[in-house]
């Protein structure tokens, strides 16, 4: 959780310095997704099984309701340990493709701290095959990876090209 929160805090600070008018929507998910407050996002965690598609679906609903891409620069970022129910992978991939098509930038960061059970997750491997010029995956294993991962994600921002 520390690595993901560090990454999101850095991202949050960057966005607030780059843009004058910023609105951030935080989505938390396990088997269901919900929009949460900034406080809940940074200080509480979700537990239980994971359906990544629920988070992506909720993000798309929020974008459709409040942040039409013709009026907003829309960015979506997701950090995860990479675990997902196998049965959800096709839906997660389809919705990730839809987020990439909708957003200026969509990034996926997989958090695998050094010294923990490390494996190539089905999510990271699957998402690395997703072809979109504004979609980027990163692997974050330590504090030292947070800044380079942040820079790698922002390099795919199609709003600045």
Question: Residue locations for each model-derived region?
Answer:
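Acidic, glycine-rich A-domain
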Residues: 1-161
